[in-house]
Amino acid sequence: GFDELGEKGVLAGTVEQGRADLSFIPLALRKYEILRVDVTDKTAADALRASLPDSTARDIYRVVFTGETDERGIDLKSLEERFAPDFFRLELRDETRVGEDVWARAQEDSLRGFFLRELRAKLDAAQTEEERAKIQLAARFGLAALDGRDL
């Protein structure tokens, strides 16, 4: 699984007094790879395409998106539909956070502004990275609800 990345195989060779002649023989048909892709200031599709190695068709990939996005986040479903044929298996994860420009809208005199002000205060008071991630996710879902969008 993803806890053992890269090629798997055995070492074969001969060992004699004062000398060892060993070579790695890959045994696994597929490799597990984790690819972290920063999407700050670019689309997720462009960032993923630029990060991919030449050949992925035989291997199993987990792609973790990082960096900052707008309030909509990343549409993992459409990315999976678009890129899955290029992989034996593809798993996508969104670990992005809401960009700073979204928080600037907290000054609006509106329900959106009130919502963002309340969440920003919680974000500033958060003690752990896990708390911050939950608040970022709450912002993304809340803004989607205010706009009538699905995530």
Predicted regions mapped to residue ranges:
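Conserved beta-sheet core of the metallophosphoesterase superfamily
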Residues: 1-17, 98
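Accessory, non-catalytic peripheral segments of nucleic-acid enzymes
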Residues: 17-151
